[in-house]
Amino acid sequence: MLNIAYCSDKYQYTMGKSFYDSGMKDKRAVFNLFYRKAPENNNWAVVSGVDEVIEMVENLGNMDPEFFEKFLPGEEYKEFRGYLSAMKFTGNIYAMREGEIVFPNQPIIIVEGPLIEAQVLETPMLCIMNHQMAVATKASRVCRATNRPVSEFGSRRAHGPWAAVYGAKAAIIAGCASTSNILTGTLSGYGSTGTMAHSYVTSFGCSVAGEYEAFDTYIKTHKGESLIMLIDTYDTLRCGILNAIKAFRNNGIDNSYEGGYGVRLDSGDLAYLSAECRRLLDEHGLTNCKIFATNSLDEYLITDLERQGACIDCYGVGDAIATSKANPCFGNVYKLVEIDGQAVLKRSEDKIKLINPGFQITYRIMVNDPSKGEIFKVDVTCLRGDELSRKIEAGEAFTVCDEYDRYKFKTFEAGEYQAFTLQKKVIENGVNIAPKYTLAEKKAFCHDALMHFSPSERRLINPHYYKVDISDDLYNLKMSIITRLVKEINHFSTNK
């Protein structure tokens, strides 16, 4: 069985050796996991993967010294290997809840603990979070393209079994109505769903009669269950839909059937074919028969089908979700922001890679708008315990300024807002204290959070930007470190 805690890069451990030998192993470090830019011109992403991160952290240290000798050989590593074998994570971890909506540069996960313990979590944590957040964010986009149910059907296209199982979980959190993956359904208690393959139809003989026999047999062997006939194996309109109607009627499947029944289209002009199938089904009194559509769908194709008035009741989406096809690599990073109480940052040659230093906390501010109801108005990331953080915690009036335009600001008066802390402690002194949520609860939480943003902020194309700021104290700390660094660099470069 793989121990995912050691799905890591070797340099995490060679750096750890330096920390260990130089007496730095117990320095208190704070790392932030965050992303800089949302994919596909989104303003935000959907959090998924936190539960697997916690599980991974709990498995740290469950390996014999012989395991470490395989990649850290030699007598000079012997003492360090013994340390690693016994090393468990003893610090604290704060994380956003799965299903939360997160914006660029906000800490999704904050790791606070001894330096080596915190450092070696980087690679496996990013592996988990980048995969699941890519899938969840894409699934949210696909689901927002329609008000009709979207099922996740992408396991066969996923990048391995692990990706299929946890990708399906992420897709459901972000809005998918169901998944075809039975392992995800079994582990989560959420259940799974499915239809039939073309091979099922052709196994009864490559003929029109064989197609009817396939449908008839399936109905007879699955009475009381969902009955979805795949009707495009040979010809959708000239035999497929007609055989499905005949099989339904001959087996007494009509609008009184409680198990749910329908047909699936997997090729061709889905808008035209769905309209024709709807007409034929209705003519035969099967008005409750659902029409499912698959065939390399994504949010853009679904949006276009909806625009054309396609008679589709449910969509099945595979690789577009399972691989986050248009943006398969999510951009979470894991950066040191504080060491032994001293804030640090990475300045970099690229402005986008400049990070926020210090031990942080993010608040989401909600107001009751007379015309829109309860809506989120601004997110602000503060240094823990700074002036703005204290005001928000006390419910006092406060003002937030735009980080890049200090003339843009907004004041919230006492009593007119509610504040929600986005990062909650999930591991305390190495002990898992995270609350347990079902997959259905995570999905409901994500939907509820999304509905508190305005429609313009949720749209797929050119969404309106939601206000995301940092506190004055955090801004000033960042600027002071940068100013000091620039002076040091200038002095160093001119006096070398």
Give a label for each model feature:
Residues 193, 263, 291, 313-315:
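Hydrophobic residues within beta-strands of alpha/beta enzymes
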Residues 22, 28-85:
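N-terminal, Lys/Arg-enriched amphipathic/low-complexity engagement segments
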Residues 1-28, 37-39, 75, 81-284, ...:
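Buried, small/hydrophobic-residue-enriched core segments of structured protein domains
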Residues 49-52, 76, 134, 438-442:
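Short amphipathic alpha-helical segments
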Residues 30-32, 90, 150, 333, ...:
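A residue-level signal for beta-strand positions that form part of recognition/binding surfaces
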Residues 68-69, 137-141, 154, 458-465:
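Short coil/turn segments at secondary-structure boundaries
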